[in-house]
Structures are given as structure tokens and as C-alpha cells.
């Protein structure tokens, strides 16, 4: 059985960001592999952040128009199990800000993985290879040069 993995918002966003073709390709592969293996999970928070990140700004700067962002969010909710916060996630996130010095949003995402028993968090926003509690963080974009 594949390791259960939590997908961070940045992977969802890069899937639609043509400005970074290498990251777009990797994000697409990560999501396809997650669907094929049934191992990937997405936090409620990441769906909310995805819609905001891809549809903000003027028309010329948006990755997706608002309707397309909503449609893609709906597709993610069909394709992946969505993990929702409860009081235990919120309490764990509060501890994560203190124990690991994480921002509130990063601590909340980590806490979602920790509480739901997800072993791996895929993100470029954490320290690659570090264990946060029982959750291992892996950055799938490490092979991409910083300029792309």
C-alpha cells in the first residue's frame, strides 16, 4: 500500500502555472500519481487557497478565471479525499506554531496531516526531509533550478 500523502496548495497551483513549465510538469505528475495510487489527500485549506491563488489579480495576471478555478476545485474534490479540520487539528496547529516556528497556515496544514495519520507532506514551503512530529516533508520541486 502506498504511503498516504498530503498535497500542499503550491502543487495544486503549479499545475496551472505556465510561467514555471518544469514545476507545472512535476505538479501534474504528482497529482496523476496520487490519483493512480489512491494515496494523495488534499486539505480543505488547500482547496480554499487554490481558488484564491489562481483567480486573484487582474484578468491578465490570473492563472484561471474565477469560474475555471471553482470548476478545478470541484474536480479536486471528486478526485481526492479532502481532509477537514476539527478541534484537534486546530489545537495541533497551535502547538506546531510554537514547537516548529511554523506560520499559522503551514502549521495548520502540517496539523491536518499529523491528526489524520498522513505520513508525508509534499510542499516546497517546509524544510525538505525534515520530520515534523510523525510527518515527513518532501519537496517534489528540488530538481528544478531556482530560476524556473
Each predicted region: which residue ranges?
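Hydrophobic helix-cap positions at the C-terminus of alpha-helices
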Residues: 33-34, 76, 96
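Helix-adjacent hinge/juxtasegments
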Residues: 54-80
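Acidic, PIN/NYN-like endoribonuclease modules and their adjacent C-terminal/linker elements
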Residues: 2, 110-148
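Short, well-structured N-terminal submotif of metal-dependent ribonuclease cores
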Residues: 1-42, 59-67, 144-147
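Aromatic- and histidine-enriched alpha-helix N-cap/loop-to-helix transition segments
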Residues: 42-48
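Active-site neighborhoods of divalent-metal-dependent phosphate/nucleic-acid chemistry enzymes
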Residues: 79-121
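Acidic active-site catalytic centers that drive phospho-/nucleotidyl reactions
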Residues: 8-10, 49, 106, 125
Amino acid at each position: 500500500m502506498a504511503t498516504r500523502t498530503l498535497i500542499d496548495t503550491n502543487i495544486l497551483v503549479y499545475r496551472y502555472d505556465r510561467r514555471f513549465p518544469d514545476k507545472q510538469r512535476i505538479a501534474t505528475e504528482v497529482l496523476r500519481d496520487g490519483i493512480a495510487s489512491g494515496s494523495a489527500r488534499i486539505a480543505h485549506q488547500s482547496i480554499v487557497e487554490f481558488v484564491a491563488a489562481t483567480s486573484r489579480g487582474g484578468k491578465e495576471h490570473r492563472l484561471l478565471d474565477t469560474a475555471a478555478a471553482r470548476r478545478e476545485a470541484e474536480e479536486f474534490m471528486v478526485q481526492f479525499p479532502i481532509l477537514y479540520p476539527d478541534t484537534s487539528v486546530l489545537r495541533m496547529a497551535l502547538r506546531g506554531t510554537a514547537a516548529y516556528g511554523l506560520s499559522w497556515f503551514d502549521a495548520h496544514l502540517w496539523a491536518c496531516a499529523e491528526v489524520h495519520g498522513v505520513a508525508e507532506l509534499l510542499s516546497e514551503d517546509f524544510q525538505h526531509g525534515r520530520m515534523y512530529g510523525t510527518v515527513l516533508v518532501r519537496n517534489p520541486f528540488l530538481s528544478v533550478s531556482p530560476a524556473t
